[in-house]
Regions:
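A short beta-loop-alpha structural element at the N-terminal edge
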Residues: 5-17
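Conserved catalytic-core motifs of GNAT/GCN5-like acyltransferases
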Residues: 70-73, 78, 120-123, 140-157
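Conserved GNAT acetyl-CoA-binding A-motif
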Residues: 111-123
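Acetyl-CoA-dependent GNAT
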Residues: 8, 35-93, 104-105, 164-165
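Conserved GNAT-fold acetyl-CoA-binding loop/helix
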Residues: 18-45
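Glycine-rich acetyl-CoA-binding "A-motif" of GNAT/NAT acetyltransferases
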Residues: 64-68, 129, 155
Length: 166
C-alpha cells in the first residue's frame, strides 16, 4: 500500500474532511460537537485557512483522504498572530497507522516558516491517545479547564497543551 502524500487541502477535499470530523463525534473523545456538521457549514472554516500562515493539510492516498490537520488562529487578536491551535483527525479505518504522528511532526517542523512560535492543542482530559501523542512531541499541559464540556450528561475537562516551536 502506498504511503499517503501530505498536501494542502483543496475545496474538493472538504466533504472527506467533514466526513472524517463527523466520524469522531459519536465517540465523544475529540470534539465538542454533539451532532454531525454539514459541508456547507464548514465552508467558511475551510476558507479561513491559507497555505502561507494557517494551512489545512490532508494526507491523501490517491483520491482518498485518510487524515487531516488544521492550523487555526488563537483567540483572533493581532497580539496572538504567532500562536496557532492545531487539530488533527484521522479516518477511523486508518487509526493506528501513524498518520496523526506524521501530521503533528510536520506541523512542528514547518511552524516557524509559517511565522508561528507557539502551537496549542485543545484536548479533552479523557482523550488519552491524543494526550499521549502530543506529549510524545514535547507538548506540556498549560491549562486544565475542569468540567467545561457536557457530553451526554457527563462533564469533561478540557486540557490546553502547548509547545514553543521558535
Amino acid at each position: 500500500m502506498d504511503e499517503p502524500i501530505l498536501r494542502d487541502a483543496i475545496e474538493a477535499d472538504l466533504p472527506a474532511i467533514v466526513a472524517i470530523y463527523n466520524s469522531a463525534i459519536p465517540g465523544r473523545m475529540a470534539t465538542a460537537d454533539l451532532e454531525p456538521v454539514m459541508v456547507e457549514i464548514r465552508r467558511s472554516w475551510f476558507d479561513e485557512h491559507n497555505s502561507g500562515s494557517r494551512p489545512l493539510w490532508v494526507l491523501a492516498r490517491g483520491a482518498e483522504i485518510v487524515a487531516w490537520l488544521s492550523f487555526q488562529s488563537f483567540y483572533g487578536r493581532p497580539a496572538y498572530q504567532a500562536t496557532a491551535e492545531i487539530s488533527v483527525y484521522v479516518a477511523p479505518e486508518h487509526h493506528r497507522h501513524g498518520y496523526a504522528r506524521r501530521l503533528v511532526g510536520e506541523s512542528l517542523k514547518r511552524a516557524p516558516a509559517l511565522g508561528l512560535k507557539t502551537l496549542l492543542a485543545f484536548i479533552f482530559g479523557h482523550n488519552d491517545p491524543s494526550i499521549a501523542l502530543f506529549r510524545g512531541f514535547g507538548f506540556d499541559t498549560w491549562a486544565n479547564l475542569p468540567a467545561v464540556a457536557a457530553l451526554d450528561g457527563v462533564e469533561r475537562d478540557l486540557l490546553i497543551l502547548g509547545k514553543r516551536v521558535a
